[in-house]
C-alpha cells in the first residue's frame, strides 16, 4: 500500500529468529548482535545528494551512537556512517519509504533532518520548500485560514535568512535572538 515509516534508535527491536530489528525489510537496516560468527559486513560509501541529507552536516549530533547497524535490502542507502555503523539510512519498500536515524536529540539541525525525513517518507519532496527558511535555526509556521506567517529564530544570536513562499517569492529576514515575527500573507 505504501506509506512512510521513521525509525529512531532501535526501532522494532526484539531478538527473534536471528533478527534484531523486526521491520528490517522496511527500514533497510539490521543490527548485528554477535550471532553470525565473524561474518564481516561491507561498509558502504554514504550516498550523496539525497533529499533527506541536503541540510545535514557531517558532524550532526544524533545522540548516543548505535553500533553494528548495517544495510540490508537492495533499495537501502546509507546517508551517514559513523564508527563503521549506519547512522542515517533511507529505504524504499513496495510503494512505501522509510528512514532510519540512530538517534535524534532536539536541535535545529535535527529538526530540519526530521522535517526532511517526513516529507520524503510521504513522497512530498516538492512541497518542502514553501514556508521554509534557508537557515535551519529559523522555523516558519503558516496559518492559511488566518493568512498569517510566523517566522521564529530559535538561535540565541542574530540570524539573517531567506524565507521561501508558496507563490515562488522569497523574502530576507534579519532576526534578533529568539525573535518571533508575524506577517500577513
Give, region by region, the residue ranges found by the protein language model.
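A conserved amphipathic helix/loop scaffold
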Residues: 1-185
